[in-house]
Amino acid sequence: MKDFSDVILCMEATESSKTEFCNPAFEPESGPPCPPPVFPEDASYSVPAPWHGRRPRGLRPDCRFSWLCVLLLSSLLLLLLGLLVAIILAQLQAAPPSGASHSPLPAGGLTTTTTTPTITTSQAAGTPKGQQESGVSPSPQSTCGGLLSGPRGFFSSPNYPDPYPPNTHCVWHIQVATDHAIQLKIEALSIESVASCLFDRLELSPEPEGPLLRVCGRVPPPTLNTNASHLLVVFVSDSSVEGFGFHAWYQAMAPGRGSCAHDEFRCDQLICLLPDSVCDGFANCADGSDETNCSAKFSGCGGNLTGLQGTFSTPSYLQQYPHQLLCTWHISVPAGHSIELQFHNFSLEAQDECKFDYVEVYETSSSGAFSLLGRFCGAEPPPHLVSSHHELAVLFRTDHGISSGGFSATYLAFNATENPCGPSELSCQAGGCKGVQWMCDMWRDCTDGSDDNCSGPLFPPPELACEPVQVEMCLGLSYNTTAFPNIWVGMITQEEVVEVLSGYKSLTSLPCYQHFRRLLCGLLVPRCTPLGSVLPPCRSVCQEAEHQCQSGLALLGTPWPFNCNRLPEAADLEACAQP
């Protein structure tokens, strides 16, 4: 067998007719090169080419396999490009537009969590009022508390303007620059209204000075100008009656540069007053400026009436009376006489508590002080009023809202020894007339209570309206009967009291709980007398509870909620109760 170390196939011309193999190992070094091969002219004759040269004529590539690879690679590339474009578009949509806030807040407010959220307020120029006038209405933050650290901002009760939830305790900390002060305005208010704002309330406290203002009801307070850079706002609700809450704004201002709304009166100490507090007979400003020039403001309204009889009426009588009026008629007749007063064509704005437009009638007592006979409003005229002395004062007041036709009134002086009462009326011992239907109704209609002195044969003893105390928290007091409805706090049944007191179970852990319980039960479940009337707790009960509980409530962030001076003293055992 012949072993070749190298084989070279040389093809030069198509004219070569034969193929020669050359092995350099057997050739001389100076020998001639490999002669060119000679191929026959027959075209049918072919020589296969080496694999490292041109392809043989009889072999073709697999084109279908190549195009399949190209198609797969192209599809993969397009898929990657589409994914990249989608990612870029998503990032562009998520990015805030130029000039927008870096911490945008949703229109519905932040979701309330167990931790106190931090709320970044708007940094745009202009006051909140200016923003509203320009048509920009920022969405109020309805979260339950938080930190308000911007130079201005809005906040509101949870769910506003829908009713706020029960058992709520929200705390907002308003913080502005230390060289600025805070101005705050409550634009809308609807919170359960009870004396001293005992149940639902909004408290404003500039820190570290302490409590300043407690708010409830439906009338927003005037603009508040403070001298503090940190304001604490607390909103508390119990488990029963609800309202739609409040909506407020604040802004930073230079100290001493506060302002008031266009319909408010400004005192020189940056105190703002509502129109109802101007020319009301009480100096609210330190310089008394709110009670000056009142006669010019209410010209043709009120006056002194000294004749034995006379007539007076509201401005623009039988037409719409003006807004923001304060008229006072002083009726004075000779001593030894009394005054009978009657109203005609009575038409004032109606409201359950006569808070807006109303008439008040006062009479003088033996000491010369004025005492209130009654406040009246609506379309039903007041009853005939008879004074026990020779002086009466009639006060007519209107607000800036609804107006009506007003009234006219006549008065007549008569000798105090005469009886001016009609056939269906009985006279009070201290003077005045009351209808027979009001006698022995367990309510003191006469100022001296003589209408309920029912021991005589004319009036049989009334049926007792007392009922057993059923409120668990108030069992074991010095009395065991009460009477409802309770007009002091506006509760109809004891079941309502149970619902209210359920929000105060947390106070049972306080060392002063028993003192606070006596006061709270004395107010909500008052003592019932044998005649069916009720007695409030004595002032000493309230003062003792305040002394024992004030510091403990302060630790809970709640100031003392009662004004003890509104309760009677214990000098008269029939005037108050010791629960």
Swiss-Prot record:
Tissue-by-tissue expression: Specifically expressed in brain. Strongly expressed in medulla oblongata and to a lower extent in hippocampus and corpus callosum. Expressed in keratinocytes.
Effect of R517W: Found in a patient with high hyperopia; uncertain significance
Localisation: Apical cell membrane
Name assigned to this protein: Membrane frizzled-related protein
Listed InterPro entries: CUB_dom, Frizzled_dom, Frizzled_dom_sf, LDL_receptor-like_sf, LDLR_class-A_CS, LDrepeatLR_classA_rpt, Sperma_CUB_dom_sf
LDL-receptor class A domain span: 259-295, 420-455
Keywords: Cell membrane, Disease variant, Disulfide bond, Glycoprotein, Membrane, Microphthalmia, Repeat, Retinitis pigmentosa, Signal-anchor, Transmembrane, Transmembrane helix
Primary location: membrane
Lineage, broadest ranks: Eukaryota, Metazoa, Chordata, Craniata, Vertebrata
Glycosylation sites recorded in the entry for this protein: N227, N415
One Gene Ontology cellular component annotation held by this UniProt entry: membrane
Other known facts: This protein is produced by a bicistronic gene which also produces the C1QTNF5 protein from a non-overlapping reading frame.
Gene name, Swiss-Prot/TrEMBL: MFRP
Keyword Ribosomal protein attributed: no
Side of membrane Extracellular, spans: 91-579
Transmembrane segments: 70-90
